[in-house]
A protein has these predicted regions:
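Extracellular receptor-binding modules and their adjoining Ser/Thr/Gly/Asp/Asn-rich linkers
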Residues: 1-52, 61-71, 78-120
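Cysteine-dependent deubiquitinase/ubiquitin-like isopeptidase catalytic cores across multiple families
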Residues: 55
Length: 120
């Protein structure tokens, strides 16, 4: 039979607990690892054996340990070639200034990637 390539979307959803000084704690979800690369900067690496032609969509947010926390999180980079997404947590009082989320917070994200599968 003939082979055809068909784009498929794969959803990767996860969350990680944040400890003291922004340390990455326990995670929930599959197909990713999260590392803290600097204050307020986190890299999500997709655990994919195949190529990732495109990262179609990514979103992230914080669940705070207390109601008085006011930081925000943004997507800095989408790197399909290296299967990585960089997230930056910002201090709400200082725009574009990376800051660790408070201990006890949860960083959660949703990523849609395009993958190519041979059928036929």
């Amino acid at each position: 039979g003939a082979n055809a390539s068909q784009p498929n979307l794969i959803m990767v959803a996860g969350r990680v607990a944040i400890g003291a000084t922004g340390a990455v704690g326990a995670s929930v979800g599959k197909l990713f690892t999260v590392t803290r690369t600097a204050a307020g900067l986190y890299t999500v690496t997709l655990d994919s054996n195949g190529a990732v032609p495109a990262i179609v969509y990514a979103a992230a947010n914080l669940v705070f340990a207390t109601g008085s926390d006011t930081q925000t999180v943004s997507i800095l980079t989408l790197d399909a070639t290296n299967k990585k997404i960089t997230l930056q947590v910002n201090d709400a009082g200082t725009v574009d200034t990376a800051a660790d989320p408070p201990s006890g917070s949860i960083l959660q994200f949703l990523i849609l990637v395009q993958n190519t599968v041979s059928v036929g």
